[in-house]
Structure formats: C-alpha cells, structure tokens
Amino acid sequence: MMKKRITQLLLICLLLPLCAGAFTSCEKQDETLTLYVYNWGEYISDGSDESVDVNAEFEKYCKEVHNMTVKVNYSTFASNESMYAKVSSGSTKYDVIIPSDYMIERMIKEDLLAPLDLEKIPNYAYIDDEFKGENVYYECNSEATYSIPYFYGMIGIIYNTSIVDENDEQIGSWDLMWDEQYKGDILQFNNSRDAFGTAQYKLGLDVNNEDEEQWRLALDELLEQKKIVQGYVMDEIFNKMQSGSAAIAAYYAGDYLSMYENNEDLAFFYPQEGTNSYIDAMCIPKNAVNKELAHYYINFMCSHDIAMANALYTYYASPVTTVVEDPEYRDEMGEYAIDILYNQADDVSSQAYLNLSPEALAMQNILWEELKAKSSIGNGIYIGCGVILGILALIGVYQLIRKRRWAKLYD
C-alpha cells in the first residue's frame, strides 16, 4: 500500500546550497513580512500524516538563511473560476497564486500577472524542458515567462469496485458517468469548464470549440445526467468517495491516488474517448505586494526536496526532473501510482483547455447557470433556495420600510 509520508530527511540544511545567494535585495531584519499564497485545496505537504510542513520550512529557511521573519498566509480555492473572481477583483492582494493553464492564459491576456525574473529562480533549471519555451502553450507566445509548473496531470474516472460491477461494459468510457443503474451514486464536477468537458469528451466534441450549438449538445448531456447525479462537488469528493457514500466520479488522477490510500475498493481509468490534460503553475499577480519574496517562495518550491515532499503528499505528477528520477520517490509512490501518473498517461488521447474568448466565456456561464437552474441538486443548492431568498429579501425590504415609517411617526 502506498504511503503518504516522507521521512524527516528533508532537513532545511539540504535546501541551503540550492537557494543561498540567489537573493539579497529584500532582506528585512526588523519586521515580519507576510506572504499571501492562494492554492488549490489538498495541494501542498502540510505536516499532516508525518509529512513535511512546506510553508513552515519556508519560514524557517527565510529566517536561517536571510535573517528575515516571514509568515505564510496560506488560503485555498476550489476552482479556477472562483480564484479568478477573487484575484481580478483586487479585494485581496495575493503574492503567489497557482492557477491552471487556460486560466493563466486568460490572466496574461487581461494583464493580471507579472512576468517572472528567472535569474531569481535558479531552481527553474530542475524543471523538465517539456514545460519550457514553446511547449508552454498557455503563455500566449510571450517572450516573458509568467509561470513555473507546480504539478500536472489528467482527469479520469474513479469508481468503487464494491458498488460498480467490474464487468460493466461502461468501464473504460465516459458512459459510466451516465449509467442509470448507479442513479444517486454519481458525482459531477462543480465547476463549469470541467463539467462541460466531461460531456464534450463523451460526445467527441472539441472542448475548445466556441460554437454554441456544440456547447448546447453538451448541455443536453448534462441535463440528462442530472437526473441520476447525487451532487456537484469539488473537495467534497474526498469524503464521499473514501467513505463509499458515492460510487462514481470524474476527478484528477493525483487526487484519486490520495483517495485510494484510504479506500482500496476504489479503481480508476482514463476514458477511451479522450480526456483533459492540465498543468497547474505558480504565478505572481501584477498587484502583488511582495514580488521579491514571491520569487523566493517559487524557487523554494522547485528545490528537489520540497518538490519531492509535495509530490509524495499530493500524489500529483511532478515537473521536477530530479524528483521523477529519484529512486526513493519511485519506491515510495509504488509501481501502481507511477504507472497512472507517468506511463498510462502517455497512451491516452488528451486535450488541454485553452482560454475561451469573452463571448464564449459568457455563453459558458449562461449555460452553466441554465444547468444549475434546471437541476434540483448542485452543491446542496436547490431551486427552492432562490424562492426562499426572494421571500427573505421581500421581508427585509418590508421591515425596513416599516421601521422608517415608525421612525417618522416619532419625529
């Protein structure tokens, strides 16, 4: 059985030769600097299950190497869309964010990201060439570099072998997500791009096509599926699949491996019709306050030991070549996980999401709202909630008017 742990051989002293001397200009000894990091949930080694607490190690590194007192303020998001809404609003200024490829492309085009200074990220040398230069399809052919890969992977289908018949002909296909015999046991993504993607791949459509007719075909599939779906989820999937309260779900390969460790009845496949491949990468927002410190952090995350700690904890595929080649990493992960992350993935037809035009994004959002409005489920939100909220709003207005009238009577 795979283990989600790495021994405390990852001492901070091992990182010093990798990072010392790379930065000098922002050392501040008399104040506490706060680094605001915004990442996906369950996506970093956090000290649980005998793992390394990466953010605590970064704080220690800054103190021991640069004599800086640093506090990492770490928060998480559940979808690219929710992350984008918060970052683009400017309500909170983050220093490091970790979006997916298509969202990075959008944020570059909207001038929301700062170009990176690669001289301040010497550990970039450990990133596989597959994720550099012209291979970075989401950086708009820019001469500047806006992102450093964090993890990559593909979407597949998870199913519970104690509930789903192993001889089911739908295993291996997206059709399993639409199998009526598992009504009430199927989970769908609670984000528009991935949810529509499942239907588009099932139908053999181009996920980057902007033709409304094709998107409506996908909507029809999702509307049909909603009749048998238990719920629309993101991070909630961990508890539901591990506990056996749901039987089938499309999700990310790395997260499947994490769930598998807690429930060996779970199994996984990449759909034969094709699926989504993605890269999540570290970026610095243009309005970041601590850009220099953000470079420290990104460089730290690319160091061998920290990248390996994260890869072992999250079970995602690492873009750091020294990690993938490390015998300790491969042994700790086990053949099954390595096969899913690095071997099977090479044999599967996949397509990355690209940024859609503003018009297509608006269409996608309208169709997503249409799906949710016609569904009695969706992350615990029911159609009746809209009615209830409307009634509550009317009551609130009524009470406000009533209070004002009484106030006038006593004036």
What are these regions (language model features)?
Residues P285-V348:
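Mature extracytoplasmic/periplasmic domains
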Residues Q344-D411:
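Conserved C-terminal helix/tail region of periplasmic/extracytoplasmic solute-binding proteins
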